[in-house]
Curated annotation (Swiss-Prot):
Name this protein carries in UniProt: Small ribosomal subunit protein uS11
Keyword Ligase among UniProt keywords: no
PROSITE patterns: RIBOSOMAL_S11
Family the UniProt entry places it in: Belongs to the universal ribosomal protein uS11 family.
HAMAP family: Ribosomal_uS11 (MF_01310)
Length: 127
């Protein structure tokens, strides 16, 4: 059976976009979208080879952010608004990595959901 090679679809995007960073206690997910909300590129710490507790480190966050930003930069994105959600480590490292690739960060907005005394939180760890 012959294998068919699939060509990646290269689409030019508008220079403006948004970066959504979800930093949980266990992982980091970075999604770059255009103004309409269509995904341009995405990356996560697990996708970049980090496993276990190494996924939630500032270095993993930096590598993940660079991977997603390079792909978006190559497609033509230049200016982004950053939306951060979650309490995880490496939130600042992800933003610095975006600037290092060449994306101009216009605004940074923290959209972490905070309960108005909703669900009971998980019990404290005893290590």
């Amino acid at each position: 059976m012959a294998t068919t090679s699939r060509k990646k679809k290269k689409v030019k995007v508008t220079p403006e976009g948004a970066v959504h960073i979800k930093a949980s206690f266990n992982n980091i997910m970075i999604t770059i979208t255009d103004v309409q909300g269509n995904t341009v590129s995405w990356s996560s710490a697990g996708k970049n080879g980090f496993r276990g507790s190494k996924k939630n480190t500032p270095y993993a966050s930096q590598v993940t952010s660079e991977a997603a930003a390079k792909e978006a930069y190559d497609l033509g994105m230049r200016h982004v608004d950053v939306f951060i959600k979650g309490p995880g480590a490496g939130r600042d490292a992800a933003i610095r990595a975006l600037q290092g690739v060449g994306l101009e960060v216009r605004t940074i907005k923290d959209i972490t959901p905070l309960p108005h005394n909703g669900c009971r939180p998980p019990k404290r760890r005893r290590v």
